[in-house]
Amino acid sequence: QTQYYRNTISSLAGGININNIKKEHIENLQIPLCTMNQYLQYNMPGMDIPAIHYYGTDITWAEVFENTEKIARSLKALGCKEGDQVPSFLRSVPEFISLFLAAERVGASILCRMNSLKENVEAVASAGSHFMFAHDFLTVEEMNTFLSGTNVEKIILLPPCNSCDIEAMPDYVRNSLNENYTGECAHGPAIITWAEFLALGEN
């Protein structure tokens, strides 16, 4: 999988070997004149066209942008502002796309890490954020480690199947997903559900 991404990046970069970046490669980089949100809105095939197929659910471009706006409002309600880093441990789910775009609208950036717990905690601590995103299989032990080792006060939890039809998910994917639920799931006053998070932007 790693090699696939390397080949893809190399292809997008005009065949540049990302393991051997040279000075001229950096000098020739062009800074985009638009945001990712603007680029997608200019180039998407139509608002009613599905942008994401996610295990039995089609999510249109209109829904992507609508969800992006909702998340952006909720981020602002949590105090997120320009220059902030937003820690996210979400996997490849539709909500991550809208979260990424929403952070850009606010002027923030997404901090993604999938390392050891210790390394993840160090990265979140360095970001200085008082909230983070994770899936609902985050354990109580992991939650307490983040709360005690960082500035995080609130953790927004998202079920991986929030936007999918679970019956349309292949058994091997479902079994792999279930393997992530390894202990007592995080709960308590520091936890905000995804629905509660979205509701913050409605007030």
What is the role of each PLM region?
Residues 81, 130, 153:
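Short acidic/polar active-site loop segments enriched in Thr and Asp
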Residues 101-110, 125-126:
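Short hydrophobic alpha-helices that are characteristic scaffold elements of the AMP-binding
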Residues 13-20, 38-60, 185-186:
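AMP-dependent adenylate-forming
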Residues 31, 49-101, 118-121, 190-196:
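Conserved AMP-binding/adenylate-forming core of the ANL superfamily
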Residues 115-149:
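Conserved ATP-dependent adenylate/AMP-binding module captured primarily in the ANL superfamily
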Residues 1-34:
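Flexible, non-catalytic linker and terminal segments flanking ANL/adenylate-forming cores
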Residues 142-203:
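ANL superfamily adenylate-forming
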